[in-house]
Every structure is written in structure tokens, then in C-alpha cells.
Amino acid sequence: MPGPTPSGTNVGSSGRSPSKAVAARAAGSTVRQRKNASCGTRSAGRTTSAGTGGMWRFYTEDSPGLKVGPVPVLVMSLLFIASVFMLHIWGKYTRS
């Protein structure tokens, strides 16, 4: 039988049926949580300040692109919804 997989499960590698494998595992073994060595180093290399970039550049003044406030976005979305609604009504009456 091959060594343990990284996830701690042996999917398809055992000759036993899945119900017997689960019963054998649940009967005498304890559940172990895998320790990931890169988990601590991954967050240490990442900076989370607002001015450095990433997702937060979307909300700052130095983000590239068109600056649109929340009120025009709300108005445009409501106009889009109204136009789709009107097209549905127009299509319903022109088809019949």
C-alpha cells in the first residue's frame, strides 16, 4: 500500500470497500490536522496596508481608470433594470 497522501485520505488506493475503510478509520484512529509549513510564511510576505496595492487600490484616489461615484452607479443600474423590464413587456406584446 502506498504511503499516506497529503490530505490524509486514501481515495481509490485501498482494496477495501469505502464503508469498511471508514469503519476501520473511525474505530481506532484519531483525527490529525495537517500542519502546513507554508501557512505562516504566506501571510508574513503579504502586506495589508491600504496604499500598497492589491484590492484596496480600487477604492483609493491613485487607482487607474474612470472615477464613478456611487450615485451614478445606482442610477445606471436602475436604468438598466428598467430597460430590461420594458424590453420584456415590449417583446410580450409584439409576439402575440
UniProtKB/Swiss-Prot annotation:
| Stretches that traverse the bilayer | 71-91
Q: Which residues carry this modification: N-acetylproline?
A: P2
Chain ranges sitting on the Lumenal side read 92-96
List modified residues, type Phosphothreonine: T9
Which stretches does the entry tag as region Disordered? Answer: 1-54
Which GO terms of the cellular component aspect does the record hold? cytosol; endoplasmic reticulum; endoplasmic reticulum membrane; endoplasmic reticulum quality control compartment; endoplasmic reticulum Sec complex; membrane; Sec61 translocon complex
Q: Which organism is it from?
A: Homo sapiens
- Topological domain (Cytoplasmic) residues are 2-70
Q: Which residues carry this modification: Phosphoserine?
A: S7, S13, S14, S17
The question of whether Magnesium is a record keyword is answered with: no
Outline the subunit composition: The SEC61 channel-forming translocon complex consists of channel-forming core components SEC61A1, SEC61B and SEC61G and different auxiliary components such as SEC62 and SEC63. The SEC61 channel associates with the multi-pass translocon (MPT) complex. Interacts with TRAM1.
- Function description: Component of SEC61 channel-forming translocon complex that mediates transport of signal peptide-containing precursor polypeptides across the endoplasmic reticulum (ER). Forms a ribosome receptor and a gated pore in the ER membrane, both functions required for cotranslational translocation of nascent polypeptides.
> Which PANTHER family does the protein's record reference?
SEC61 SUBUNIT BETA (PTHR13509)
Give residue spans, biased composition: Low complexity.
40-50
Record: disease: Loss-of-function SEC61B variations may cause autosomal dominant polycystic liver disease (PCLD) in patients that lack variations in known causative genes, such as PRKCSH and SEC63.
Q: Which GO terms describe its molecular function?
A: epidermal growth factor binding; guanyl-nucleotide exchange factor activity; ribosome binding; RNA binding
- Give UniProt keywords alphabetically: Acetylation, Endoplasmic reticulum, Lipoprotein, Membrane, Palmitate, Phosphoprotein, Protein transport, Translocation, Transmembrane, Transmembrane helix, Transport
Q: Where is the composition biased (Polar residues)?
A: 1-17
The record's subcellular location field reads: Endoplasmic reticulum membrane
GO BP terms in the entry:
ERAD pathway; post-translational protein targeting to membrane, translocation; retrograde protein transport, ER to cytosol; SRP-dependent cotranslational protein targeting to membrane, translocation
Q: What is this protein called?
A: Protein transport protein Sec61 subunit beta
Record family assignment: Belongs to the SEC61-beta family.
Q: How does it sit in the membrane?
A: Single-pass membrane protein
What are the lipidation residues for S-palmitoyl cysteine? C39
Where does the UniProt entry say this protein principally localizes? endoplasmic reticulum
